Amino acid sequence: MILAAALAICAASCSEWTDPDPKFHDPVNINSEAYYQALREYKKTDHAICFGWFSGWTGTGSDLYNQLRGIPDSMDVVSIWGGKTGLSKEQKADMKEVQTKKGTKVLWCQHVVDLGRDITPAGHTALEYWGWNGSSYDGSDEADEAIRKYARAIVDTVKHYGYDGCDFDYEPNFGYRGNISGSPAAMHVFLSEIANHMGPTSGSDLILAVDGEPQTLLAETGPLLDYYIIQAYYCPGDYNLDQRFSGLLAKFGVLEDEETIMRKTVWCEDFEKYQTSGGCDFVTRDGIHTWSLMGMAMYYRPSLPGCRTGGVGAYRFNLGRSKSDYYHLRAAIQQMNPASK
């Protein structure tokens, strides 16, 4: 079954988010333009998103596993995991279809490690092309200008291919430490330049998100981001999510209130491992036993009654298509944004 626009439209405030009165009614014919118009309008509303990293993208073939058009209609944001450049005409058409027909946002995903990663032209060294390539960030004017130049090149590339923003994979303490990622100050230089063109302070509709270890960034970097995407893989319960959230609150709480941080936080599970089950065994703070993606969709803060999270997501979520036709993602969407009756 296709889950999509038959979802309750979420209002702006957290208290209104729990209003049981349906604010949206599903058009009778889900193949009609009225259906897709309603779907696009739903995705513009204030609601918890469904996010995921999409792998093996070809945009063509008999297997919709490789095509964005085969994902659940109500998925809000997709981050391309690998193969994000040199797009074929089939990939371009596939991306444009889900963007224009379904209102799905498609993001450029990239590890942030060293200056020039994925962008330095062939035949050039980072030093000669960008103007700096120290082993670690030194705070010099040369370093800052090189990092900003690199950031602008990424922005230009993202816009060239028609992506809806960036998802930067930032994991300096998990094997991806470089002359940018190894320094929160360098990351701030990098992301503040990106934020001139995308994210909540840019005035654009392009998304700027950081996944992995956003809590390692400087506090002043937080307001530049739309989402804190947390790889809460193999999460056994709310107590674990509480610990992770406490790290975000400790870092960004000096500039953002708890509600803002909550509404930006997207919990993610690993579907490379849990594509058939939706996650590991999970226990909520209310004693409910479920699978972890569903537990993440049910997450709430006692200190913020009625306030939604940013949403949930999954790594390599499209592996679940052949196993269950995205059952676990669809169920999580329904939990966060119940369909009108």
Predicted features by range, described:
Residues M1-A4:
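Sec-dependent signal peptide recognition
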Residues I9-S13:
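C-terminal motif of bacterial Sec signal peptides marking the signal peptidase cleavage site
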Residues C14-K341:
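Secreted glycan hydrolases and related glycan-binding modules that recognize and/or cleave
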